[in-house]
Amino acid sequence: MMNHKTLTIILAAVLSLACCTGSNDIEAIQERAGKTAEAYYTHLINGNYADFVAGMDRADSIPADYREQMEANAAMFMKQQNDDHKGISSITLSKCKADTANHTAEAFLVIEYKDKVSEVVCVPMVERAGNWYMK
């Protein structure tokens, strides 16, 4: 039978391993959620409005006419960005913070406009069945 000291050492080693493994997992989750948000916004700036809308949470269950309105709103948004900033030159992921217990994340994207202005936007994300979607 193990003594108390041996059991404590084994427990500490197991907990240390669990903590280290968890940090790697959270980094991978944050990277995946953030890169997914970046990909959805890349669809937006490339004019692929249907793909952008498809990246929204539960987009597969909305009525077709509402989906068309959302795609039209995305197109209007891009027109406004073209009018205000001569368009968007790039979207890049700055950082992402995930809440693994709630299967949510916040992706911070840097939008670089063609008029040299930039801004950071927060894209709330939710994970469903292993896939990340915009809230």
PLM region spans:
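The N-terminal extracellular segments of secreted preproproteins, especially immediately downstream
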Residues: 18-19, 95, 121
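Sec-dependent bacterial lipoprotein signal peptides
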Residues: 1-20
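Short, low-complexity N-terminal intrinsically disordered segments enriched in polar/charged residues
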Residues: 19-46
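Extracytoplasmic/secreted envelope proteins and their assembly/folding machinery
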Residues: 34-41, 49, 53, 71-74, ...
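Short beta-strand edge/turn micro-motifs at domain boundaries
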Residues: 118-135
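Short, well-ordered alpha-helical segments enriched in acidic and aromatic residues
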Residues: 46-63
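Surface-exposed, charged secondary-structure patches
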Residues: 71-118
